[in-house]
Amino acid sequence: MRRMSHTKLHTRRLGLTVLLLILCSVLLVSCMAGPNAMWIRGIFGLDVNDYFAEAPLRQLQPDGTVAALLSNMVGIIVSDSIHLTPFSGTSEAVRIYRDAILNDMLRDDYSRYTGNRQAINSVSRVYPYLSTSTLIAKDDFENVVFRYFGGTSVSHKSGTAFSYLSRAGYYTSPLQARECVAEVEIRELYETEHTYRMQFVLTANGETSDIYTAVFVKRNDGSCYWKALR
């Protein structure tokens, strides 16, 4: 009887291991999409609340304090268009609205992010041929994302309007901050156990958007953050 060489035996074992990992991955994905999804996600420490399914506890006034807060949070993702792209969760929100968030930061605190000599000197040491006066530190961007969109980690990438200077840790743009041209018109606003759920439209230049539904998760300190837009 011929004996299998050590190399062939090792290759076969490696192949079986890879096959087993693939099967486990397929099984895990099917569980995440099936009836056991909530249980599986809970094991991994993911948010398992179905916020859209929460029953309304009370209706809030569209001209009240909460309404004003949420309208301002809508303004963070609005710049020069009344048409918004739906999202769910922090990562997707940042991927879609990175430029809009940075633009809102520049718009709200122009003097902080323009002409900051300390930031300019820091960047020029790493990018000596780059001439820019607009710089937003990645830490500032992360703080804004955590405050208004939740999450625990933020990716940093260049967008269309803002470029990420990875070696210096700053965002920069040659463009001026765009003003928010749209008005938020609230159609319905409800409070649930864990959220505020708001239906609204955007209006600008005589045009009105489709009706959007936004869900904001409440924090214990009275603040809230974006969860989803539909």
List PLM regions with ranges.
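Terminal low-complexity, poorly structured segments
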Residues: 5, 10-19, 23-24, 53-56, ...
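Gram-positive cell-envelope targeting signals
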Residues: 1-52, 216
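Core segments of small alpha/beta cavity-forming domains
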Residues: 46-170
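Short, flexible beta-strand-to-coil junctions
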Residues: 106, 200-206, 218-220
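Acidic, glycine-rich flexible loop segments
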Residues: 162-208
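Short beta-strand edge/turn micro-motifs at domain boundaries
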Residues: 42, 46-47, 58, 209-230
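Intrinsic disorder/low-complexity segments
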Residues: 8, 34, 38, 54-56, ...
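Generic structural signal for short, solvent-exposed loop/turn connectors between secondary structure elements
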Residues: 152-159, 204-211, 230
